[in-house]
Structures are given as C-alpha cells and as structure tokens.
Amino acid sequence: MSMATDVTNSKIQVRDLNFYYGKFHALKNISLDIAKNQVTAFIGPSGCGKSTLLRTFNKMYQLYPEQRAEGDILLDGQNILTDKQDIALLRAKVGMVFQKPTPFPMSIYDNIAFGVKLFESLSRADMDERVQWALTKAALWNETKDKLHQSGYSLSGGQQQRLCIARGIAIRPDVLLLDEPCSALDPISTGRIEELISELKSDYTVVIVTHNMQQAARCSDHTAFMYLGELIEFSDTDTLFTTPQQKQTEDYITGRYG
C-alpha cells in the first residue's frame, strides 16, 4: 500500500518494501515517507510488523541470514538496501534504542564514549564535552555528573533508558529509532522519556514503535497503523486518532480488537 507524504520533507522513503523471515511474508508492499525532524509512530497489535519495519531502517536483520528485505528504503535519497551500503556508517547515521534498557557493562562515561571512539578520534577534553552534551540532551547530566565513573547498572531503569538514548545520540546520528522504549518503565520514567522524545525532534528524525496508543497520540506528529504485515493507514497523528479513514484503524483505536 502506498501512503507517501511530502517527498521534499522526507528523511526516509520506503517503496514497495517486502520482508521475509525465511518463507514467512512479514511485511507486504509497504510504502511511506518518514518526515525530517518529526516524530513518526508505528502502532498496531502484536505481530503486525511494526518492529520489523523499524529494524529495516538500520538493517538489523542482517545479523540473521534467513531474513531478507526486498524493495527500496531511501535515506537522504540513497538506497540502503543495496549490498554496497556500509553497515557501520549506516548505524552511525541511524541510531537505535531497544525495549529494555541495555547499558554496557562499563561506567556511565564509557557507555557514552564507547561508540564515539569507533568513528572519531577526540581529545580527552573534546570527549568530556561530548559526554556532557549527550547526557544533557538526554536530560541525565544533572543526575550523573558527580558519578560518571560509576557503572551504568547503578542507575534506575528510567535513567538507564535515558543513558541508552544519550549513547545513541552521542555519535550524532540523523535518525533515532525507538523500539517500545517505555514498555519496561514506570509512569514517571515514561513521562520523562516522552518529554525527551518531543525535544529530540528539533535535532533528529525520530521513529517510535509503541503498543501504547495514548503515547503515540502524545508524542508523535505522524502515525502509521499496521495490521498483519500491511500498512493500513498513515497520516498526521491528530487525523488518524480523531477521524480515521479505515474501519480497521477505527476498530483498533477504539479497542474493538488488538
């Protein structure tokens, strides 16, 4: 299904994307545009393909040889699905934060510095500045500035997830992918992450997968509803939640199934 938006404002353009887990056809003819410096949410019931779609944007599936994508995904006009794509550089441009907080088994400081060192050779002073910048962007600096050399595991769950966001933006990507980033967090921590998502779009293109429709409504500018591997509806968030065009969308957001 084709649901393109304004191409001139697109960071990612998906065209006729099909995805397979072995012989299982998980994504079916997906076409949509992800707008620059906006938050796009993917919603739908479990197994609908929303996380699969998200993970095609940085080719996470390449870790598993039985998985494959067909079609086109253009990032700034370049098709990332070609074999010529440098995976390391792609994942530097397209950062990802997972469902459960995944701090590295190292200090808070080194959690941030680790990825930066893979792509840049910074002086200690410049690295200190980058670490502070990333933690500040992730609304974590004031809580960690006096314990940067303590383990990342010493932080609370909500703090660990913000640490993962700081780690993701420290390498200065263009796009930030968030796969159910609040599902393991308490309501207060969730609120802080949602505030952070709204702030991050001034610098990044953000794509979030969420089971929480209220979260999608609060955080996103555009929302895609998926069902059984198909893109059912894609529009600006207010329109999708107030005047959905497809009965399947209306049934889902009103709780008739899901």
From Swiss-Prot:
<protein>
    <recommendedName>
        <fullName>Phosphate import ATP-binding protein PstB 2</fullName>
        <ecNumber>7.3.2.1</ecNumber>
    </recommendedName>
</protein>
<keyword id="KW-0592">Phosphate transport</keyword>
<comment type="subunit">
    <text>The complex is composed of two ATP-binding proteins (PstB), two transmembrane proteins (PstC and PstA) and a solute-binding protein (PstS).</text>
</comment>
<dbReference type="InterPro" id="IPR017871">
    <property type="entry name" value="ABC_transporter-like_CS"/>
</dbReference>
<keyword id="KW-0813">Transport</keyword>
<comment type="similarity">
    <text>Belongs to the ABC transporter superfamily. Phosphate importer (TC 3.A.1.7) family.</text>
</comment>
<dbReference type="GO" id="GO:0016887">
    <property type="term" value="F:ATP hydrolysis activity"/>
</dbReference>
<dbReference type="InterPro" id="IPR027417">
    <property type="entry name" value="P-loop_NTPase"/>
</dbReference>
<dbReference type="GO" id="GO:0005524">
    <property type="term" value="F:ATP binding"/>
</dbReference>
<dbReference type="Pfam" id="PF00005">
    <property type="entry name" value="ABC_tran"/>
</dbReference>
<keyword id="KW-0547">Nucleotide-binding</keyword>
<keyword id="KW-1278">Translocase</keyword>
<dbReference type="GO" id="GO:0035435">
    <property type="term" value="P:phosphate ion transmembrane transport"/>
</dbReference>
<comment type="function">
    <text>Part of the ABC transporter complex PstSACB involved in phosphate import. Responsible for energy coupling to the transport system.</text>
</comment>
<dbReference type="InterPro" id="IPR005670">
    <property type="entry name" value="PstB-like"/>
</dbReference>
<dbReference type="GO" id="GO:0005886">
    <property type="term" value="C:plasma membrane"/>
</dbReference>
<keyword id="KW-1003">Cell membrane</keyword>
<keyword id="KW-0997">Cell inner membrane</keyword>
<dbReference type="InterPro" id="IPR003439">
    <property type="entry name" value="ABC_transporter-like_ATP-bd"/>
</dbReference>
<feature type="domain" description="ABC transporter">
    <location>
        <begin position="12"/>
        <end position="253"/>
    </location>
</feature>
<keyword id="KW-0067">ATP-binding</keyword>
<dbReference type="InterPro" id="IPR003593">
    <property type="entry name" value="AAA+_ATPase"/>
</dbReference>
<feature type="binding site">
    <location>
        <begin position="44"/>
        <end position="51"/>
    </location>
    <ligand>
        <name>ATP</name>
    </ligand>
</feature>
<dbReference type="GO" id="GO:0015415">
    <property type="term" value="F:ATPase-coupled phosphate ion transmembrane transporter activity"/>
</dbReference>
<keyword id="KW-0472">Membrane</keyword>
